[in-house]
Amino acid sequence: LLWNGRRNRDEKNLEHNSKFQQMIRKLLVLLLCLTAATATAKKPKSSASKKAESSAEKPKESDYDKLFKEKHTVADGMFRLHDVKGKLYFEIPDSLFGREMLLGSTISEVSDNAAATTGSKSDYPLQVVFTRNDRSVQLRTVNCENITDETGASRALAEAVKRNTADPILRNYKIEAWNRDSTAVVVNVTDLFVADVEEMSPFSKYGLYTAFELKKTFQKERSMLGEIKAFSDNVVVRSTLSYIFTLTRGRTTLVKDQPLTAVMTRSLVLLPREPYRPRITDSRMSVFPTGKVLFSEREQRAKVIYYAHRWRLEPSDMDAWKRGERVAPKKQIVFYVDDGFPEMWKKHIFEAVDQWNEPFGRIGFKNAIAAKPYPKDDPEFDPDNIKYSCIRYAPIAIANAMGPSWVDPRSGEILNASVYVYHDVMKLLNNWLFVQTAQADERVRAVTIPEEVIGDGLRYVVAHEVGHCLGYMHNMSASAVIPVDSLRSPSFTQKYGTTTSIMDYARFNYVARPGDR
């Protein structure tokens, strides 16, 4: 019995040990499986796995990078300009929203100079401002004709005028992207520069075709973006615009579906933050005006006032100027002379500008105005940029010259002025000299008038147009103060001329008779 009992205990122990060993074996198998799984996890990842993981970790491409990831033309300045496959994008910084600008258009090339003249500005520039909301950027034309008297108008009156003369929206552009540091927005402005914008049309109101009824159709497929430039206070965009046009007069069609292509240079110029102090015109002085309607509580009516057009001519040394000394201005008035003029003309054109230094000297300025050749080594110079005032040669059979100017509408300050001298001005001078002076001057009794005579006539014409550029209107009363018999006196005419103002239309001395000198 004892042996049987021991045997039973031994059998139970063996059974227990066997179960324990089986459990150990299972644990070992499980451990081996885990080790194998870990080893498998540490194996090099497949290329597909790497791509998936890289894609997950790579930051999302921004709208800005998507727009400009391909190679394209960029111009940096007041705005950053991007030309992407013929589309023009403006990158407008936050600091320039709300700043007033001038948008002007100049004709750089044209296929038909009867429609417009190279170098001319077909219309007045637009005063514009950029505004924005969260979704879009608005290009607005500034409504500044109605003003209030700062000292005599209440805030309520000023707000009422503002509400009733809000700035209209010329264009509304979707915000395409923000730049990388979120300080500027990007908009596509192609439709402002490669489109038919009536306010910037290449068909000049001074062209020969204004005598006819003109119907034009813009040809988008033949139009394209050109050169872009950007500077610290302006940007320049050149584009080629194509049209077909028809000319009629009454029931007669003179030209039908005639093609025209013009290269236009558009300048967007930042206006000074603080406008020049306006000066109210004096009716006794013939100066060009900019009209305003003044609303004031001190007046019992809306009052029309006029700001005089004038250059910002300020003494460089105010104390010396007040003592009566002649001083140079802080900024000289400069006219750049077109290098396309016939060589014989140039000398007389430079003299025409320089002679204006005499009247400026009488008000205390020396070297107030100058004529200079087109600069060869200035990368910023562009005669079609409204920053530069020029005297332009127009090879067209028009017997005339003209001197328009552009002003800051807020103050009347002249910002740009150009003289256009048409080729047949020489024909006009030839006719004037022969008809008006041949009876007393045998030198003009010829098919070709000597340079000393016709050159002096050209100087007179250009000086008259420069006077317009300085803000002066015609003064038809100037010659009325000179008695007729004085016009036959050599001593008088050599000292005083034939009129008291070059802005008169007193061409030449047609009162002189044979024998007078």
What are these regions (language model features)?
Residues 479-517:
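Conserved catalytic/binding loops enriched for acidic/polar residues
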